[in-house]
Amino acid sequence: MHRAKIRISTIILLCLLFVPISSLTAQTKPDAPIPDTPAGKQLEGWLRVFASGNQDSFVRFIAEHYHKSLLDQDTAIDRAGGQARAYLDARSFEIRSIEKSTAQEIAVLAQASLTGLWFRLTMKVEAQSPYRITEYTRQRIHPPAGSQRKLRERELVREIKSFTDKLAAVDAFSGTLLVAKDGKPIYKMVHGMASKAYNVPNRIDTKLNLASIGKTFTAVAILQLVEQGKLSLTDTVGKILPEYSNKQVATRVTIHHLLSHTSGMGDIHGPKYAARISSLRQVRDYLPLFVDDPLSFEPGARMQYSNAGYILLGAIIEKVTGENYFDYVRRRIFKPAGMVATDYYETDLDIPNLATGYTNWIEQGADYQEFHLGPRRNTLHYGGIKGNPQGGPFSTVEDLLRFSVALRGYRLLSAQSLDLMTTKKIFFRKYAADDSYYGYGFELENINGQRVIGHTGGDLGVSSALEWFPDSGNYTVVVLSNYDRGGIIVIDKLQEMITLQLK
């Protein structure tokens, strides 16, 4: 996902946890009255404008009511783009309780009307008239204790169907979903169009873009080579690629650093990427995009999500095996896992049953995007021609379940290697109300005290997730969407349902 005005080189997937509407509706309170204070009046005005869904109104309200100190950081147009993104996820907020209220500050607990998602909304204003807004935050929180009823598996399936039907009815989701228990599907769902231009609906076997889920394939390939004794996690880039011209990277960055996003390397996107996008088909084509970039910090010091690092892992796989990266992954991962529809398809070819992405982001230059409400645009001219070691293969929900079953059944890696991949290596980010960590090619979360393991993906017209729940009945969830946020909305809701509500 993206910010309101965003450098493609700093695309960050913004994620929220969702809760089931039908489980909450009967137990929620009516809107709490907002206090008649300067802060309360500003919040009430903001809520009214937000619920209008009019982006021009967002801009006007922000320009007139936000303090100059905030507008100096981000313009009214930039901030309105962020509010537009939030609007698509929430539609409006229903105030459930007042947590704090003074003349200059108000904090409320609220639910998003579309999803039932809980937030803490905080607003501060200046001390004198006209009481402009000096701070506004929207923080995801866990549902209050007792606000959700427990579900049996049959009820879980009904809740999922009800929720996804509601999202599809307002065009918030397009794509496919599969839920499995013990590796066997218990629910499949399809909504939306694979091609709006040709009126082709999505099918359960439609191939959709995975974005960064593809990093798991690269990580598995590297761990296979470690098992074979062809690589060590402590090997430096220069040991494997002595010709790599960036000596800072070659001498200080190890395989461990690349896998865990702790190398200090950055992204591949930017003006260079935009200028060469139609010619990027092989791993070697990507190296000039970042080979001269300095490290942002000493390797191992902290985490910085790095697409460039995973491209470099692809180059290492090619050097060690003497094989094209794509051929290796097909032979050693896709084929043994039984994945019959997954590949790094070239999108300028007419591939049957391949979904087109649709986005609310509009290019405003080679390295900038702005988010706009209104009709989504197809991404035929935005995305790359072909996926690569950091992401972008196409697959189906059924194929990704096959991958999960093969990986967890130790057909691709040993139990020791899988445990190594799915053990916390570094703090990743604050994910909604919980912390998220990174292993080797896997995101590791602890949601409501239960482990969630997998990977998400996001790009223009792409949102995807593959996750399993080892402490919660051994469920696996695969969701693929050809909308910017559709897949994330669904996976976040299912995380909450499975870890908090399932009996």
Locate each region found by the language model.
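Short active-site loop at a secondary-structure junction
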Residues: 67, 168-176, 198-257, 297-308, ...
